[in-house]
Each structure stands twice: as structure tokens, then as C-alpha cells.
Amino acid sequence: MGKVYLLGDWAKEGYYKIGVTKGDVEKRIKKLQTGNGGEIYLISYFETDFPFELEKMLHNRYQHIETHNEWFEMTNEEVGGFQKACEEFQESLDALRENYFFKKKHKK
């Protein structure tokens, strides 16, 4: 189980980070905060059995607005739709659970 998160930065309005952690989101924020001049804050996160796949799907969805290192210049509408996008992609990942090749890759 892991979490895909959406973070903001008070110093960079309109820029958001889509990332992943298998641990605690707050600890991840503290780690990212080191060396960052602004204040990073949590907007939302989504728990999933497939955190890295979900993160990749989100990065692909928003690749046209990626600025650097998993940071994206997003509109308020895109930020507001983050949770819904996660849910939609999770449905796709859930449907793949029974696919032989997907199951083989994701054995626990």
C-alpha cells in the first residue's frame, strides 16, 4: 500500500507536485521541505495498492504542463480534479488485477 499525493508550495502559486510514498506523507513533505525556500503543504493524497503505477498515469495525464521534477503548472480546476483522476485511474488498475501479465508483475 502506498500514497500518491498532491503538494503545493506557498512561494510558487500555481505549481504543484505529484509524487508517491510508501511511508508517511507528512514525513515525505518534511524531506522535500529541506532545501526548498518556500513552504510545501499537502493538498490531497490517495491510498492505493499500485502507487507507482498510479503516479505514472497521473504524470502522463499532466505531462503537457510539467515544469520540472514532478512539478506541474496546474489550474484550480485541475487541482480540484486530482482526487477524481486518482479514482478513475484506480478503477483501471483494479480492472487489470485479473490480467495474467499484470498479476505476474505485481506478485506480493
Enumerate the language-model features and the residues they cover.
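Non-catalytic accessory segments flanking enzymatic or RNA/DNA-binding domains
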Residues: M1-K108
